[in-house]
């Protein structure tokens, strides 16, 4: 088509495409009918097939691979792989063939991958042990009772000495008790008591207080007033000191202790305070609460308070109780003390601070609370590093993240087998497994206590006895009785449950006779608790501070007894943690290999039954290779995660909480515990999870959105709304003060 412009003589030519015009006409707008019909007709005109509702896109498979598929993939691992096409240069124009666009598939929430336990692990750099334990060296029991000394030589009365020998089975003092009791009785200075864990610090400050009260020669009752206030960082430690005080008070029944801790009814505590108490033991928050709001407690303190003891001072500061302690001391110092009623007692309040360490914040607390104090240390100078007991055998195993769970199973199995061989039918073996968070405790407790339903509850749901037929630990057959009790303990449990669980774990009775007791717990059980006959402490998650490491392993090898401790570390940066804790282990440690020294002894010579197979198809006499047994055991736990939604929720919560807890290590230790260096997928394997970490995050977000949506009120239908509006109009019309 041409156009001639007569004004300027220009000739314009326009070229049009006939096919485009026809296509435009053919793709006219469709009118009439429903929008769905119009949409369907338009897609048919464009040559697209309408998608049927409910039809899924052909993406990845949502189902988990079966065990047979895993075995097939592992057996064909040596087969030749498909050749990989070399990458083309972005400047290569040799081919003009149009390449298909790259489609990025969306992340699937339920996609799962079964990975092998023993492949694709990070190399372990530590080959030789730089701090090897000398097994031939002579062991000196650093916190054992002294043979050549007695309590009566320190000025303790015969009544108290006899009670210690007969009722409490304590005949000899420890080194720290020998150093503390004489200056405590003189009451000339405040005291800073520094000693190893398990050396007897509790009796070191309780015995002089009892001796001072018994030496008064006056008629003492519970109404005579409170002589001592003991403040501890945790409820469990406060409860333990209360039990020791009550046991000591049996030789002088007129002395009454009182326990003030969170989680208990304040009304009951106030009633006990009104009746009178000679010893008050409690946690900082609850003690301050009563000092501020309970009038009778100040009346109890005025005539008799002479001793204020702060136990585990480093933990008090670590938990942020500095301001609370200052308020407690300000209130106490503001009370006018009557020295005429008990003239033989000290003329002022004697402050005592106990701690296993003498550096950092605890020194600051000592400067705040103590005046003209005397440092008493069990043979160690203040500048020296606190060391572990000499009779403690420390072991360290470097475990790839995928193998953490099965290695823990192997360790617990080995300890149980040792209990069967070396212990008698009445001996009790106790093992404590420390984990980083309460959700991880719940998961591991569920793994080892209720895998196949063969268990019986003892203390609510926090203690379970494994019964005959249990295949998870430590026997893998249907004929042997496991003789294992599993416990869990963490701060999220109620105080009554925590107390009952700890009491059951620490008591030797018919229920625990001849059994292996396993306690899964957080650091709530790492401070000051004197649990009898703890043979092994397992630190599956490294502590958040080196002081916590000392207190954790201090639950064993107490009062001259032998003990073992096992620390789990990951390959890579965490291996440097060994050099960091080396000064605290002058006797060295044993470096174990996870495969040959942990897994092989536990799983060799067995035939672990697969849970997806019938018992009739299982030949228990046909032994399998140890690595096959370990893999089967772990896959059994993974199948349970798939089949049990509640157990899967515990696994996901445990994994996510473990990641968050891992990021809270002290800044000085970040070079060993760096979150960026973790392989999150392999770590998820240790929680028996097959999902990718991103999928778990999306699942949690989707679950939270669903929970929020379920809380929304249902939409009101038109009929209900009309009736509601009519009733509202009637009420307004009947109101005589309606001016609308």
Curated annotation (Swiss-Prot):
PANTHER family for the chain: RNA HELICASE (PTHR24031)
Q: What keywords sit in the KW lines?
A: ATP-binding, Helicase, Hydrolase, Nucleotide-binding, Nucleus, Ribosome biogenesis, RNA-binding, rRNA processing
- Coiled-coil annotation: which residues? none
Compositionally biased intervals (Polar residues) = 13-25, 72-81
Q: Where is this motif: DEAD box?
A: 311-314
Q: Which protein are we looking at? A: ATP-dependent RNA helicase DBP7
Positions annotated to bind ATP = 195-202
Q: Which regions are flagged for Basic and acidic residues bias?
A: 43-60
Additional comments on file?
Answer: Present with 1460 molecules/cell in log phase SD medium.
Gene Ontology annotations for the cellular component aspect, listed alphabetically: nucleolus
UniProt xrefs under InterPro entries: DEAD/DEAH_box_helicase_dom, Helicase_ATP-bd, Helicase_C-like, P-loop_NTPase, RNA_helicase_DEAD_Q_motif, SPB4-like_CTE
Catalysed reactions, as listed in the record: ATP + H2O = ADP + phosphate + H(+)
What PROSITE patterns is this protein classified in? HELICASE_ATP_BIND_1, HELICASE_CTER, Q_MOTIF
Query: Which ranges carry the Helicase C-terminal domain?
Result: 414-607
- What function is annotated for this protein? ATP-binding RNA helicase involved in the biogenesis of 60S ribosomal subunits and is required for the normal formation of 25S and 5.8S rRNAs.
| Listed SMART domains | DEXDc, DUF4217, HELICc
Where it mainly occurs, coarsely classed, is nucleus
Q: Name the Pfam families for this protein.
A: CTE_SPB4, DEAD, Helicase_C
Q: Where is the Helicase ATP-binding domain?
A: 182-376
Task: Describe the family membership recorded for this protein in Swiss-Prot or TrEMBL.
Answer: Belongs to the DEAD box helicase family. DDX31/DBP7 subfamily.
Residue positions of motif Q motif: 149-178
What's any GO biological process attached to this entry?
rRNA processing
Q: What is recorded about the protein's domains?
A: The Q motif is unique to and characteristic of the DEAD box family of RNA helicases and controls ATP binding and hydrolysis.
Query: Which top EC class applies here?
Result: hydrolase
Q: What is its EC number?
A: 3.6.4.13
